Amino acid sequence: MKETCTVCMHRCRLKPGQFGRCGARKNVNGMIVCENYGRITALALDPIEKKPLSMFYPGSVILSVGSFGCNLHCPFCQNHDISMKNADEAETVFLAPEKLALKASELRARGNIGVAYTYNEPLTGYEYVRDAAKIVKQYGMKNVLVTNGAFSEAVEESLLPYIDAMNVDLKGIREDYYRKLGRSEERRVGKEC
């Protein structure tokens, strides 16, 4: 039986065993499951300006983490080698939310201010971002989200209480351009998000 994923505007109707357009969400026994939860493809200590957030704790560094999966298909994506893979293709290392938060805290001596969820579209696996962000907050550190902005209001409501700064990476300003990138029903998305 098909199930509908409600994370983004695509509202993928997935048969059992089928991945959504993002490559990170899958119908498993009638439930939409986040296949990239804790499956890390990239982890680095980056300057905050690389996010790019030049006015948010300028001169600091932040532990940047990413997985696989993206709900847009931009031909100019600088991280396509990780963001466009699905669970069956991506090379990953599992890192529990607690371990990520602990690692971020241990890097304070090097100037780390928290965790940035980046490199792919992190909200294809928003459950991991939410769970990690809660723990990062308990350590008194910051959470930064680098996103394409294509997520549902329900996802937004579950995450925003834990996010300190966000960069919404606009790809263009016209509906027809976003359609080329795979972002359908732009009017509804803009209204919802």
What do the PLM-derived regions correspond to, one by one?
Residues 130, 184-185:
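Charged helix-capping and loop-helix junction motifs
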Residues 78, 181-182:
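Short, flexible helix/strand-to-coil boundary loops that buttress conserved ligand/catalytic motifs
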Residues 171:
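Cell-envelope and extracellular/periplasmic
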Residues 85-86, 174-180:
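A short acidic, helix-capping loop that chelates divalent metal ions and anchors anionic groups
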Residues 3-24, 68-80:
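Local cysteine-cluster metal-coordination motifs and their immediate loop/turn environment
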Residues 27-165:
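Conserved Radical SAM active-site core
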Residues 186-193:
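Conserved small/polar residues in nucleotide/adenosyl-binding loops
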